[in-house]
Each structure stands twice: as structure tokens, then as C-alpha cells.
Amino acid sequence: DILAAFRVTPQPGVPPEEAGAAVXAESSTGTWTTVWTDGLTSLDRYKGRCYHIEPVPGEADQYICYVAYPLDLFEEGSVTNMFTSIVGNVFGFKALRALRLEDLRIPXAYVKTFQGPPHGIQVERDKLNKYGRPLLGCTIKPKLGLSAKNYGRACYECLRGGLDFTKDDENVNSQPFMRWRDRFLFCAEAIYKSQAETGEIKGHYLNATAGTCEEMMKRAVFARELGVPIIMHDYLTGGFTANTSLAHYCRDNGLLLHIHRAMHAVIDRQKNHGIHFRVLAKALRMSGGDHIHSGTVVGKLEGEREITLGFVDLLRDDFIEKDRSRGIYFTXDWVSLPGVIPVASGGIHVWHMPALTEIFGDDSVLQFGGGTLGHPWGNXPGAVANRVALEACVQARNEGRDLAAEGNTIIREASKWSPELAAACEVWKEIKFEFKPVDTLDV
């Protein structure tokens, strides 16, 4: 069975047992009345069952309802169908004030019907020939308004300065000021020029997201013809069907696939209603993607530390133990489905580097947009500052130093011999984003 943990907030007067049973019925075989065609099938075999209910500590009138869905209710290899069943009509149910899907347990038999990520973490490392450290990226800013040539120039400067990747922003598709084909050409030029000068393999996440699946595939084909290593897709706005098609194309044609989660906070940010991001992360691993944005813990975007680490492990590891202290409701086994690299991006700069290195470890991409391009000396020195800071943190960690306690000291020591890093440290020494997260663990 597929197991689901729902956070249910019933309307006043509705007992939790009734609410839980209603969720299970509406998202499987039930409807609002008894119908004579019920007698033509075996409802006992196909109905969803609410098998356990527990109150949420510290929250009045909220319950975690566990529901089991027979596997035959779902089409094989279709994230789209899985979500249509589990989170379809039921979220508009009048008997509930709010409903949130907190976690899913996907049985090994169903996981095996998915291709998963096009390549996975180890194959990506081998393609890039980069080991033993997080990868560095940069989102090109301003996200909208640059011409293709200026955009390509910014990519080149960042890659030349020491970054591994640059990135199209999620809303860069094919607008009047910069058509997709022009952008692809200038970015490919930036990649090849910087590769020749640095001797390292470089990439730019070319956003293939488009208004139709056919147009999206056309862009992916053109990227492959240019010989670039990686493309990008907005998987929630583009849709799971389009994303799975693109992931299959990427595996068949040797392209890595970077996934942006634009629109996720509409779905996952409220604590009592929606779908938790750990479920969207599992869905992405099944649908297919080699990278996905996962929050930073320390930057400008929402993300509580233990919760973030919980779904980062769901993305990377092969086997995950149940751990309610990190928001993981079920033990799960990915049966050798390739892992996804989490991408930390959003309001981060060199002073965050020790924390990011400690939190995310080697199998991650640390992406500094403003934290690269906002350097007072320009894009290339911004890239140099980030690379120096990263190398210093990785070396310190490998020497056994405590990054959490000594992080600032490590950065200051490195800035003594790197003027680019010293300038970056000076610019961002006061920048903080200190707001309480909306989505926290239940205590």
C-alpha cells in the first residue's frame, strides 16, 4: 500500500474519526452517497483506509490521520495519477477546515515503476570530474531584462572566476528582450570559452520550460545539439507529465536536469493546509531531476533546519528511517533509484559558506546569485571570492575543524590572502534575514 500522513483540521463538531474516514474515502472509491454500481466491484479491495489517528501536540483540533491506499488504485510510473488520487478533490471537502499532506510512504514495488533522476549524484560527479566538495553555482541577475549577449557575458565571467555552474532564473523562458535560441547560443559560447581557459568542466542551466511540451522538447534538443552538459525545468509550473517526459529525454541523451521548484510555497508554506515540500521532493525524485532547490536554512527563503535536513536526506539517500524529530513519518526504501543533489539558493553570501558546507555536505550545489554578482569589483571577483571561501571551508572541515564554531575565523583567515574574498566579506558583513519560519516541527 501507499501510506499517507494527513494533517486534518475538522470543522467544529466533526469528530476526527469521521474526518479521517472521509479523507480516505474521497481520495479512493467513495462518493457522497451509496451508488448501485458499488456492487459491481470489490470495494474492500480498492478502498482507502484510515488506520490510525493521533492528535497534533500543541495544536487544538488538529490530527494526524494515517491512510493506506491499495497499490492497484494507481497507474504505474505516473506521479500525475498518484497526486490526482491522493490530493485531488479531497482538499475542497466541506467537512474539513484545512488539510495538509505531510508525508507519503511509496512502496518499493511502485518506486520500481519509475525511471527517477536522469543520472543521479555519482554519474554527475563523473561527468563533471569534480569530487570531494560541494559544487558552486550562480543565478544570473537581473533575472529579466538583459540582452542575450550581456547575459552570456555575465555567465562567462562567473564561470571563468571559478564557479561550476551558472543558471537561468526560473522565469527566464523566451521573452521579447531575450529569445531562447539567442540565450542558448551565447551561454554555450560562455561555457566553452571558460572551459578552455580553466581546464574545468562548466555548465549553465539552460531553462527549457515552455508553454507547450513540444516547445520544451525542441529547446532540450537544441541544447543537446550545442553539446552543453545540463538543462533546467520548472517542474511545478511545467507539470509532472512534462517533467517526466523531459527526464526520460535527458537520460537517453546524456543531459543532466536541474529542477527549479517555482510555485512550491503556494502549495507547501502554510502549516495546516497544502502539501509539505518533503512530499513534492519525493515526487520529483520519482518523476526525474538531478538537482532540486531545497532551501538554505540560513538565507532569505523559508526553511527550518531539521525539516530541511529531513527532506535533503530523502533526496540523496537510498534508505531513510522514520524520524519524527525531522518530520519524517515513514521508513522508506528507494531501492537504488538514483539520488538528487539538493541546491541551496536564495539570499546567501560568503559569510554563510561555513554553515552551508556543514549543513549540506559535499553532495550539494551552493548557489550564490546576488552573493556573486553583487561583489563591488564585478562578477569574476565575486566568483573568485565564493570559490576561495568554499575551498577554505572544505579544507578546514577535512582537517577536523568545527565549521559551526570556527566558521567566521576560517573565512577571515582566507580573506587575508584573497583580496576578492576580503572585499566580499566587507560588503555582506551586516546582511541578515532573521525571521521565524512559518512551518515548524510539532513539539
Swiss-Prot record:
Subunit note: Heterohexadecamer of 8 large chains and 8 small chains; disulfide-linked. The disulfide link is formed within the large subunit homodimers.
GO BP terms, alphabetized: photorespiration; reductive pentose-phosphate cycle
Task of the protein: RuBisCO catalyzes two reactions: the carboxylation of D-ribulose 1,5-bisphosphate, the primary event in carbon dioxide fixation, as well as the oxidative fragmentation of the pentose substrate in the photorespiration process. Both reactions occur simultaneously and in competition at the same active site.
Modified residue annotations for N6-carboxylysine: K167
Residues annotated for substrate binding in this entry: N89, T139, K143, R261, H293, S345
GO cellular component term of the entry, any: chloroplast
Keywords: Calvin cycle, Carbon dioxide fixation, Chloroplast, Disulfide bond, Lyase, Magnesium, Metal-binding, Monooxygenase, Oxidoreductase, Photorespiration, Photosynthesis, Plastid
PANTHER family to which the protein is assigned, alphabetical: RIBULOSE BISPHOSPHATE CARBOXYLASE (PTHR42704), RIBULOSE BISPHOSPHATE CARBOXYLASE LARGE CHAIN (PTHR42704:SF15)
Comment field (misc): The basic functional RuBisCO is composed of a large chain homodimer in a 'head-to-tail' conformation. In form I RuBisCO this homodimer is arranged in a barrel-like tetramer with the small subunits forming a tetrameric 'cap' on each end of the 'barrel'.
Processing and modification events after translation: The disulfide bond which can form in the large chain dimeric partners within the hexadecamer appears to be associated with oxidative stress and protein turnover.
Family according to the record: Belongs to the RuBisCO large chain family. Type I subfamily.
Enzyme class: lyase
GO molecular function, one term: magnesium ion binding
Protein known as: Ribulose bisphosphate carboxylase large chain
Location(s), subcellular: Plastid, Chloroplast
Entry cofactors: Mg(2+)
UniProt remark on cofactor binding: Binds 1 Mg(2+) ion per subunit.
Ligand binding (Mg(2+)): K167, D169, E170
Protein's organism: Antirrhinum majus
Active site annotation, chain numbering: K141, H260
Reactions mediated catalytically: 2 (2R)-3-phosphoglycerate + 2 H(+) = D-ribulose 1,5-bisphosphate + CO2 + H2O; D-ribulose 1,5-bisphosphate + O2 = 2-phosphoglycolate + (2R)-3-phosphoglycerate + 2 H(+)
Site (Transition state stabilizer): K300
EC number: 4.1.1.39
